[in-house]
């Protein structure tokens, strides 16, 4: 480098000197003044905090239908963040269309066809192919997408932000012609109607000291309520762990109902949102939370609208201070259903699961103690406080106490959310769903989402509840029940599940990232290499960071065990 100044003349436009300082051109992508003005107009008076990055990316995506490189650069400038930070977050989430300078923006209209197991059984693949054949690709973009939480109306798709249930080519064309791409808002119980039935009286009694936190906690423990997001941890015990930590403390609500086959949270929120909201405020009071955050999946636009309207009504009513409850909008990442990944996303980052310990009750949101609850759990907390523990512990079947909200879909006559005793068997659930479709014979079932795998019809007497399925290599999870018939292949269902895991792996750990990809390739073959698949499954279970990779092999193992003739 002794003659660096002379040699560097050959590389004009890179360096001014041989010391790596002073560029002829600005470092990185140049700032576009028009893009900056557009971003500033969209953000308005909103705070420029890093934890709001995903919210601000949504503003750009909603306004322009994509996020250009110049808008990313402008957003980074406006938020005083590096371009790399903004880019890595924007490209992590499936609902952000990041476009480089050399790429053309996508068509103005996007159709996302659900490819979950329930929709696949209902002909989603054929529907997608027909739409691709019939519609102009320059005007409409057609994508496959994971479960949208509408398995009871399969096949379903999303046109803009509007869902079309029982979708056909004709109904989609009609919707496109109408130009209506916004979600219809269902009839629901608003604040005034909820108050008229005694709503928020339980919260008032707790706030005024008529009922102590210990009393409420003991009532929950007596009821037997356990977390209904899938893990099943006793709900009341969580409060003690969080209260034991020094404040400020937060509540984070996991509304990212992304487990395929699950739609119970949406069912309750689109009908009785204030049962959930009262339960949230009771839990927040119990841990003396400084603020509450609700992380809601982007696939539920009607729910997002309802929560926005009703939280504003609660603020106007004096129930809560302004901005005490913040709703954060997901962006299409199943991994954010894992509690620590959800917290990362609320903080405006990629949804990568954290290593534990520490646990989120000790060091969660913004490194503070955080109480994490599921939507349905909070729904039941409010009901128990209003009606007493007997609404759960007073119901018993097959030696199990309580009630379960089963999301039922597949080859049944009347799919939907079925509130049944927790000791119900798959036969009870099929009966509640109107029985099998005509011409279909019960063959197999998914008891609790793809992570629970597939069980054969011969195992039809097991109560579908916490702790009853582990002996069979499965678990109840979110109680997402999909029923298969003799018209279906178990191996195809398992492949659908593993393709989902392959798509949704966050990529942080090799066993999950590579394991899911390799498993799909092996399962696509006519004959499965069962020894290699078992070795792969063992590595994924033992070495994956979070529950996604640890549970992903369940469909493989259960098909090998119960349906060997198919593989």
Region annotations inferred by a language model:
Residues 93, 272-286:
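Histidine-anchored nucleotide/phosphate-binding helix
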Residues 109-112, 140-141, 156, 248-251, ...:
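Structural motif
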Residues 206-245, 393, 407-408, 419, ...:
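Accessory "access/gating" subregions that flank catalytic or transport cores
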Residues 279-281, 422-439:
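Short amphipathic, charge-patterned alpha-helical segments
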